[in-house]
Amino acid sequence: MQQRMTFWYLLGYSLSKAIARTFFDYRVIGAENIIEEGPAIIAPNHASFLDPPLAGTACKRAIHYLARKSLLDWPVMGPLMPEWNVIPVDPKNAERSALMGIIRVIRAGGAALIFPEGTRTKDGRLQPAQPGIGMIVAKTGAPVVPMRIFGSFEAFPRDRKTPRRVPITVVVGPPLRFDAAEAAGRDAYQKISDRVMDAVAGLKV
């Protein structure tokens, strides 16, 4: 798994940051909390299609992402998805294909972006956490960096075809670490996920 920024990744990263700063007055608060080396999970809220690049450009390291397998069929951008560390999700076997891919990345010392809520909000409010991120934490022992993106829902909610020019701020909280006892057993998955989501909810501008 690619842990460093390749030419194409760095190009996408640089363009995303330039666009975010130009059109959304993009800023990051708490960037010093991001784990820049070794296994890590970046855990932002999910309000918009813009969230993956907004979260990724807050980091100074290569991040791995989940995306629908169909996105790889997009003209121009599709072939670049693997260069941007996109792990395709097969809708017919989403849980296994996605989660196992992410676990391999993290165990190899990489960083992955996981949305605790699992899907985009419909109304801009935070949603309950799903157990997926808790399972990944339990399987890998990786620390979790809570992150909250303010403004992405107002800029590009589900029902819009084009984004609005709205200020966007990313707030990063201190990493969360879970010991072996906290990660033991299936009932731990949801508890870990809930703790991560509580940390995300507690972040303020």
Pin down the residues of each PLM region.
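Conserved functional loop/turn residues at catalytic and ligand-binding sites
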Residues: 27, 45-46, 85, 109, ...
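Catalytic core of membrane glycerolipid acyltransferases/transacylases, capturing the structured
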Residues: 8-14, 21-22, 34-93, 101
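A residue-level signal for beta-strand positions that form part of recognition/binding surfaces
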Residues: 25, 39, 167-169
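Generic beta-structure capping elements
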Residues: 31, 45, 68, 92, ...
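Non-catalytic C-terminal accessory region of glycerolipid acyltransferases
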Residues: 2-11, 97-205
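Short gly/ser/thr-rich secondary-structure transition/capping motifs
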Residues: 21-29, 93, 152-155
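Conserved beta-strand scaffold positions in the cores of enzyme catalytic domains, especially
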Residues: 28, 65, 86-88, 144, ...
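A short beta-turn/loop motif at secondary-structure boundaries
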Residues: 32-35, 162-163
